[in-house]
Amino acid sequence: MTRNYLHKKILIFGMGLTGISCLNFFLSKGIYPKIMDTDKRPKHIEKIIKFKNICYHTGSVNYSWILQSNLIIVSPGITPSHPALKFATKKNIEIIGDIELFVQETKVPIIAITGSNGKSSVTKIVKEIIQKAGFTTYIGGNIGIPALNIVNKFAHFFILELSSFQLERTFSLKAYIATILNITPDHLNRYSSDIKEYEKAKQKIYKNSKICIINVDNPVTINRQAQLTKCISFGVHSGDYHLSHTYTNTWLCYKSLKLINTKKLKLSGRHNYINMLSALAIVHELKISFKISVRILKNFLGLPHRCQKVYKNNNITWINDSKSTNIASTKSAIQSINTKGKIRLILGGDKKSSNLNLLKPILKNNAIVIYCYGKDKKELFNLYPHKSKIFETLQEVMQHISVQVQPGDVVLLSPACSSLDQFSGFEERGNTFVKLIQELIH
């Protein structure tokens, strides 16, 4: 049900893309909120300055504005432990996020997707299949398109990719289909190294959902919110959707029905197959035929920065997996590689309080040579000092590798860490990797 904000004193906290989308949302209703950011010169400040009637504050927290407000819209990047939010909570001021605004505003059925890894890929696959079936759909949320940018569009379905940060401040979501693809340790710097808090945030996606899609290999993805919700499962060896193996072939299956041989897919790697199974589970609940779904899967090339083969020459393959910002994702990337040469693995960045020792089993592989850089380079180096090298920057790593690499090798950027110590995001890190290949190798 659409909420009336006319008598609310609204403060938007954060001037990123999400904050701007919230501002535009309220302006479209004739409401003029205040907006603030602790950065002195936020990236999108010019978009705010152009509105003459908007009060904005930068460089610090405006506590008097907080006291004057009775509704705060907070951007997902601002942690619950932020002093401003703690202050507002003590004053009993309502705090919500942009996704809460979105779900209160729309009556369009929502497909909600979360997970530590694979969210964007599954979101994109589901979108392509739904569109191929003749439905109108839009994606938004954590995928880089603020949800409020699509809220007024005509659609049969909205597909929301949701992070734990977004789910924290969402209370009214009633998804038609909800899924947690997987949960592995991530963002523990935000959750005080308590994975239970991370799991709790993810689990909110299931509340009041009609259909939940669960990963049977990852028990923490199982719906704890309601016993009566229809549940569909996927997994490697079991689940409604699963993989079936013979000596030479692997199939994506629905129960006893073989849907597609993985040899016919453009993507390889078990993590990609599992993502596809979850997407199949979602769209089949929309009564979309497997024939349509399989056609899309055959041609799906994946997304940039996700195990993306960016260059191959002289039998040397360069893979950009910059999106791997946690241990589980990096492990999946390594497992997907089949080579007779060396795997030259680039690790580095901010570990986000992760236990890097969890990488040790997969790094035992004698074919792996490790290159460490960035904020937590020393801890990464100490995992296997005898086969690791340490550098300050990604550029230094690439300069060294360009001299050492041999035919048959795979160079894999899969950092297992956040990029924010040296880059604006995983995209900039991945683009820098590609640019350095062009400069050093071409």
Curated annotation (Swiss-Prot):
Q: Which UniProt keywords apply?
A: ATP-binding, Cell cycle, Cell division, Cell shape, Cell wall biogenesis/degradation, Cytoplasm, Ligase, Nucleotide-binding, Peptidoglycan synthesis
- Top EC class, one word: ligase
**Annotated compartments:** Cytoplasm
Task: Tell me which Pfam families the record gives.
Answer: Mur_ligase_C, Mur_ligase_M, MurD-like_N
Cellular component aspect of the GO annotation: cytoplasm
| GO MF entries | ATP binding; UDP-N-acetylmuramoylalanine-D-glutamate ligase activity
* UniProt keyword annotation of Acyltransferase present: no
Enzyme nomenclature, EC number: 6.3.2.9
Which pathway, metabolic or otherwise, does it act in? Cell wall biogenesis; peptidoglycan biosynthesis
Please state the protein's primary subcellular location: cytoplasm
Tell me the GO BP annotations in alphabetical order: cell division; cell wall organization; peptidoglycan biosynthetic process; regulation of cell shape
> Which InterPro entries does the entry mention?
Mur-like_cat_sf, Mur_ligase_C, Mur_ligase_C_dom_sf, Mur_ligase_cen, MurD
* Catalytic activity of the protein: UDP-N-acetyl-alpha-D-muramoyl-L-alanine + D-glutamate + ATP = UDP-N-acetyl-alpha-D-muramoyl-L-alanyl-D-glutamate + ADP + phosphate + H(+)
Q: Which HAMAP family match?
A: MurD (MF_00639)
Q: Describe the family membership recorded for this protein in Swiss-Prot or TrEMBL.
A: Belongs to the MurCDEF family.
- What is the role of the protein in this entry? Cell wall formation. Catalyzes the addition of glutamate to the nucleotide precursor UDP-N-acetylmuramoyl-L-alanine (UMA).
Note the PANTHER family from the entry.
UDP-N-ACETYLMURAMOYLALANINE--D-GLUTAMATE LIGASE
Protein's name in the database: UDP-N-acetylmuramoylalanine--D-glutamate ligase
Q: Give the organism, scientific name.
A: Buchnera aphidicola subsp. Baizongia pistaciae (strain Bp)
Give me the gene this protein comes from. Answer: murD
